[in-house]
């Protein structure tokens, strides 16, 4: 869908941001930090992670990323999964993706990979086709709407904040 909009707009962009629809609230530093990942020319796709809460370890609705972070809290993704055996170098993956336009164009033309189908995780298609996904750790986890209860919480937040 993001690529379809990009084609319709018919404009040149340095980067294309895909913010997942289940993240209705986020802080601007999420996009600022993720965009800055592209100062490294080897990055194909940028995304973000945050600390994994104990309650999320066994939650299959929470996508996890394995990454070794450097002193700038950045690193290239090693894997994405819904279930984990150990929590070393495992973080909560946040559903924001920033693409170089040529990478997005190539990505949408690729067939689903075996691991993408098995895990129901689109980013595995990129990993399996050797795209470099760089992650940055942010200090907050934007609320995600995955269940009816989540939706109720977000609606209450909007109501309290006059949205």
Language-model features, listed with the residues they occupy:
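Short phosphate-binding loop-to-helix
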Residues: 1-21, 25-36
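One-carbon transfer enzymes
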Residues: 8-11, 60, 155
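Conserved alpha/beta core of the MobA/IspD/sugar-nucleotide pyrophosphorylase nucleotidyltransferase superfamily
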Residues: 90-163
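Conserved core of the sugar-phosphate nucleotidyltransferase
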Residues: 26-113
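Short, high-confidence coil segments that cap the C-terminus of an alpha-helix
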Residues: 11-13, 40-44, 131
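Short beta-strands and strand-loop turn motifs
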Residues: 16-19, 46-48, 107, 134-138
């Amino acid at each position: 869908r993001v690529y379809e909009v990009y084609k319709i707009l018919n404009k040149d962009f340095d980067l294309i941001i895909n913010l997942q629809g289940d993240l209705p609230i986020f802080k601007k530093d999420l996009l600022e930090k993720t965009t800055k990942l592209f100062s490294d020319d080897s990055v194909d796709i940028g995304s973000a992670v945050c600390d994994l809460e104990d309650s999320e370890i066994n939650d299959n609705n929470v996508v996890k990323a394995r990454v070794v972070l450097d002193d700038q809290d950045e690193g290239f993704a090693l894997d994405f999964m819904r279930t984990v055996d150990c929590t070393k170098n495992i973080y909560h993956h946040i559903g924001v993706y920033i693409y170089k336009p040529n990478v997005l164009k190539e990505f949408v033309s690729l067939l689903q990979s075996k691991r993408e189908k098995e895990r129901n995780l689109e980013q595995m298609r990129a990993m399996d086709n050797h795209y470099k996904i760089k992650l940055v750790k942010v200090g907050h986890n934007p609320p995600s709407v995955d269940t009816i209860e989540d939706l109720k919480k977000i609606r209450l937040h909007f109501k309290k904040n006059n949205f």
